[in-house]
């Protein structure tokens, strides 16, 4: 799709809620939080939202800079030697992810759900961080305990909207402690997958 004024190619994302009643409202609120948060984050290594979330009949749409693949797709393709990401591409991609996380951490923010689905590649081959619905401010964490409580309704959300515990820091899952180290653990899982044909370290 092209924007009418700039003629830049963009990616249009569409989501159709599947829940009913109160949980449908929670599902829509989660989607709005994700897109709104992403819209407010301005950094070259974070996915740029170019058109805000809009309701269209029974679905919701928004547009971002042009995306060609998620890292989940790229890592799956890497199983095939013919499509394996080379060392230079991996170095560039992980450096860009590190810069995005550094930007968040400097602002006292933690992504808390860095997975292969929350990293995408644009048309230029740049890796972009996205999926910011669970972005957590350290200012909201109790200073005496350093703990953060899960939202109860998260478990009732559709699977695609829940945290992916395969990438979650055990300190976060077991002790519910939030900090930049949560994202570093998840980044390590991604790096392992990228260098081991998409296999996770505990498989």
Task: Tell where the protein language model's regions lie, with residue ranges.
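ATP-binding glycine-rich loop module of kinase domains
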Residues: 1-31
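AlphaC helix of the eukaryotic protein kinase fold
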Residues: 29-39
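Short beta-strand micro-motifs within the conserved protein kinase catalytic domain, predominantly
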Residues: 48-60
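Conserved short submotifs of the Hanks-type protein kinase catalytic core
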Residues: 57-70
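Activation segment signature within eukaryotic-like protein kinase domains
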Residues: 93-94
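Catalytic-loop of the protein kinase fold
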Residues: 105-122
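Activation segment/activation loop of eukaryotic-type protein kinase catalytic domains
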Residues: 117-166
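Conserved C-lobe activation region of Hanks-type protein kinase-like domains
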Residues: 173-203
